[in-house]
Regions:
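Short glycine-/aliphatic-rich beta-strand segments at the starts of folded cytosolic domains
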Residues: 1-13, 82
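A short, structured beta-strand/loop element
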Residues: 17-42
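Conserved short beta-strand edge segments in small beta-sheet-based binding/regulatory domains
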Residues: 32-38, 63-80
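Polyanion-binding surface elements
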Residues: 78-100
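Major-groove DNA-recognition helix of helix-turn-helix-type DNA-binding domains
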Residues: 93-119
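A short, Lys/Arg-enriched interface patch at domain edges and termini
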Residues: 125-174
Length: 174
């Protein structure tokens, strides 16, 4: 199956030129990735990768990037963090329709991971809810990629928790 996802990285300043990085990425198996370098010190790679599973597609891409540029630091795997407009775009409805659906089901619509001037959700639980509760036709490949992206992003963030704090928090947040 074909899986579409984006890997975003921080690149240390002491790395070679962008052209050299792109060449290394190609040699490591990322030759079909669309490379974005719009912000200094950042690189984004958009993949459409054929694999047996989303996990295999994303993990093999991560491994290839780390082989090509060992000093990069993963910032985010997408699609994962989304606003209401992003969710609406994913399922092909207007933002207003998605907002109406969310408000009509406020008791069981997935809880955002951040509420501020704009709320943010993990895409995976929202897509699962839309498929199971609202009967939207969500492509399995999108759902699988969103799930693995969320798992990777959560793991990356959780790795920053101090061990002592983590033990105490497990009971408090469960």
């Amino acid at each position: 199956m074909e899986y579409e996802f984006t890997l975003k990285f921080a690149v240390p300043a002491n790395n070679p030129s962008v052209d050299e990085l792109v060449e290394r990425l190609g040699e490591a198996g990322c030759e079909v990735a669309l490379v974005g370098i719009g912000q200094a010190g950042r690189i984004a790679l958009e993949f459409t990768r054929d694999a047996a599973s989303a996990k295999t597609a994303i993990f093999s891409a991560l491994a290839a990037v780390k082989t090509a540029i060992p000093s990069v630091q993963l910032l985010e795997v997408t699609p994962d963090f989304v606003g209401l407009t992003d969710i609406a775009d994913c399922v092909g409805v207007s933002r207003q329709n998605m907002r109406k659906l969310m408000l009509a089901h406020k008791d069981d619509f997935p809880v955002p991971v951040h509420e501020g001037s704009a709320a943010l959700w993990h895409l995976s639980p929202v897509l699962t809810w839309l498929r199971e509760r609202a009967h939207y036709a969500i492509p399995s490949t999108l759902l699988d990629v969103a799930h693995i992206a969320m798992q990777i992003n959560l793991t990356k963030e959780a790795s920053q928790i101090e061990r002592g704090v983590q033990r105490e928090l497990v009971e408090l947040v469960a």
